[in-house]
């Protein structure tokens, strides 16, 4: 995975956006011959983007990436906020298997689960491979470290409870005919 360290990039600032465009182009040129890279992901969790600057930057980055390396798919934004993408990736930290299963259902004519539902300037799902590229987040650490830690769904009481919750999440993905991949974080 060729992914940028772009988390919290303020895409609304012209200088930041133009700097990112130049830096990302250099990354793609540098790494395009690495056989272990299967896709490009220039953005991660670009929650603050507005309809003008964000859409323009994502389209520019997508098109430049494709021009430099037309052999690989481009996932415009990990965690949704898609503008133009070859892979539809979302983040889903739901801890309850039944709720997660319900969220993953794709009904004819309806949008699948997505992180950003309220932004009408974003792309509409068009059947791209659908991945949950961040899930899990189950808190599990030594007793002495728990005070300053966090996670989703509360601390499991023991290792068996941890694995049961994790198994429920994974089973929800495996049982979904639409999920083509997932990544624990």
List each model region and its residues.
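Active-site mouth of glycoside hydrolases
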Residues: 1-87, 91-94, 123-127
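Substrate-binding clefts and catalytic carboxylate motifs of secreted carbohydrate-active enzymes
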Residues: 36-40, 63, 101-185
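Intrinsically disordered, low-complexity acidic/polar segments
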Residues: 49, 97, 141-142
């Amino acid at each position: 995975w060729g992914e940028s360290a772009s988390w919290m990039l303020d895409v609304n600032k012209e200088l930041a956006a133009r700097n990112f465009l130049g830096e990302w182009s250099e990354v793609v040129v540098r790494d395009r011959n690495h056989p272990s890279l299967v896709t490009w992901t220039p953005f991660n969790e670009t929650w603050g983007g507005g309809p003008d600057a964000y859409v323009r930057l994502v389209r520019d980055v997508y098109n430049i990436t494709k021009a430099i390396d037309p052999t690989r798919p481009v996932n415009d934004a990990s965690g949704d906020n898609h503008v133009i993408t070859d892979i539809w990736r979302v983040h889903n930290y739901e801890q309850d298997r039944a709720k997660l299963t319900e969220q993953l259902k794709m009904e004819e004519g309806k949008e699948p689960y997505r992180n950003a539902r309220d932004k009408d300037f974003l792309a509409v799902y068009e059947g791209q491979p659908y991945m949950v590229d961040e899930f899990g987040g189950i808190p599990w650490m030594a007793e002495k470290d728990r005070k300053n830690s966090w996670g989703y769904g509360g601390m499991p009481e023991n290792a068996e409870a941890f694995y049961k919750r994790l198994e429920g999440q994974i089973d929800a993905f495996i049982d979904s005919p639409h999920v083509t991949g997932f990544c624990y974080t």
